[in-house]
Amino acid sequence: MYNFSVCLLNSPCQELSYEISGDNAALYIILVGRPGLGKTPPLEAAYRPIRKHDYALFKAYESELETWKAAGESGRKPVLRRTVVSDFTPESLLLTHNSNPRSVVILVDEIMGMFNPANRYTNGQLIEQLLTAWSGGALDVTRVGSTMPVHIEQPCINIVGTTQTKRVHELLTKGFEENGLLDRILFVLPKSREVPKWTDWDDGGEDRASMAAARWEQILGKVLALDYDTGEEERISHVLSMDREAKEYFFSW
């Protein structure tokens, strides 16, 4: 669900979110569990296709940059587009989002480390951005040395990360309960606290796992290939509507 949110924000399939609430479909998710429970591997596996997509964009950017330099740096300088960010400042986050208006995702393994500097070094600027983005409000940032601000009319910022069970309470001591951030976070805990045992792949399980990973990559690839906008001069989100039968099926589910 979270990966689809990352791929679909500000793209055709966000229609249901707008129809219900008028907001985007961003998700803030924290996986909670004791150390060694295996929180990170499934998260990385789920995001592998998106990271692969980002890497392809990076290689294309490298090629375009070399061509631009070879041409005497004439014309518009190429811009790197990416979806996943992990190490960032509030300003760089919005600059990344401006380059990729479809959506960005903050993917942090131990997410408590992200919240600590938010209050100490940026006076809560990051938190304010996240609260505004969640509500669908526009975001602006003025780059250092530039008088032209970056304006994001329809921000779509996702958050996903992990933390240890004993550290969840730290969010309550940082004022996030009062400003409403906690109400926007989905905390996910495992049904079982036992670590799965090693599996013998002699029964063909390895092939099934590879097929599942390939199928997952194919699904996300189709979603990422959807058009973002319909406007030529302005970035206008392209929205598809459900027909009556689809709506009835969804709400019955």
Describe each region flagged by the PLM:
Residues 1-253:
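Phosphate-handling catalytic cores of nucleic-acid transaction enzymes
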